[in-house]
Amino acid sequence: MTTTNLSAVADPLRLYDETFASRLLLGTARYPSPQSLEDAVRVSNPAMLTVALRRQSAGSPEGGAGFWKMLRELGVPVLPNTAGCYSADEAYTLAQMSRELFETDWIKLEVIGDDYTLQPDTLALPAAAERLIRDGFKVLPYCTEDLVLCRRLLDVGCQALMPWAAPIGTGRGPTNPYGLRLLRERLPNVPLIVDAGLGVPSHATQVMEWGYDAVLLNTAVAQAGDPVAMAQAFAMATQAGRLARLSGPMPERDVAQASTPVVGLPFWHAEEKQA
């Protein structure tokens, strides 16, 4: 089976009641130009494009009728988010506005609890998620790798989670590998998307090898020297990590083990080993 067939047909990403061919989600902010964003989307073929309603304005390159027209023409599903919200009420209101504007029930839920780390508010996040799910939203909550928080989000009705790898925009990669791997182990049947903190394609490959279902990127692509090439690199890295996971990596060993069999070697090699 080719990797193309694996991605598009045999191994789709399943979120709520929908399936997606790609396991990469892409943000739309901070690109050098609208053209670079458009080109990055075309080469990476993401499952969804995240859009922060609060950050858009008619006078910015990321806002206005031209921006929305470009998104529609790309034909990629839009995932609005509640970036910049600091309370459950604020996030709820912005989500309702996003639903009306984008005509979608999808929402990436962000409720920030700390300005310095942009860490999610672990109390307000489940409360906001519960309200939105009651209203029919398909909520993808931005959270940490905290297992208790993640279980609480599942309890209120979330069917997928988006734990961070590191604080937003840092590009540090997974700062708590143990916690992320444990979360994957304890929630084996829950779609998990690593959101925030990935900086280079190898980070995406790593978390996909751990069994994560998808990755979401923005700054790592938008602020790269060549955003289009980086978008393509991340798409390939994500697919490589997924294929490696499904292929069953060899177990790690503490001691060396020869990869070349000794059967059939000349007799004097056997004598040397016995000596």
Swiss-Prot record:
Residues holding 1-deoxy-D-xylulose 5-phosphate: G169, A196, G197, N218, T219
Protein encoded by which gene: thiG
Active site feature: K108 (schiff-base intermediate with dxp)
UniProt source species: Ralstonia pickettii (strain 12J)
What's the name of the protein? Thiazole synthase
On whether RNA-binding is a keyword of this UniProt record, the answer is: no
Which reaction equation describes what this protein catalyses?
A: [ThiS sulfur-carrier protein]-C-terminal-Gly-aminoethanethioate + 2-iminoacetate + 1-deoxy-D-xylulose 5-phosphate = [ThiS sulfur-carrier protein]-C-terminal Gly-Gly + 2-[(2R,5Z)-2-carboxy-4-methylthiazol-5(2H)-ylidene]ethyl phosphate + 2 H2O + H(+)
Its annotated function is as follows: Catalyzes the rearrangement of 1-deoxy-D-xylulose 5-phosphate (DXP) to produce the thiazole phosphate moiety of thiamine. Sulfur is provided by the thiocarboxylate moiety of the carrier protein ThiS. In vitro, sulfur can be provided by H(2)S.
As recorded in UniProt, its EC number(s) are: 2.8.1.10
The molecular function GO annotations come to: thiazole synthase activity
Its localization reads: Cytoplasm
Annotated family: Belongs to the ThiG family.
Disulfide bonds, paired cysteine numbers: none
Subunit-structure text: Homotetramer. Forms heterodimers with either ThiH or ThiS.
Alphabetical GO biological process terms: thiamine diphosphate biosynthetic process
- What InterPro entries has UniProt attached to this entry? Aldolase_TIM, Thiazole_synthase_ThiG, ThiG
Keyword list (alphabetical) reads:
Cytoplasm, Schiff base, Thiamine biosynthesis, Transferase
Pathway info: Cofactor biosynthesis; thiamine diphosphate biosynthesis
Which Pfam families does this UniProt record tie to the protein? ThiG
Q: Name one GO cellular component term.
A: cytoplasm
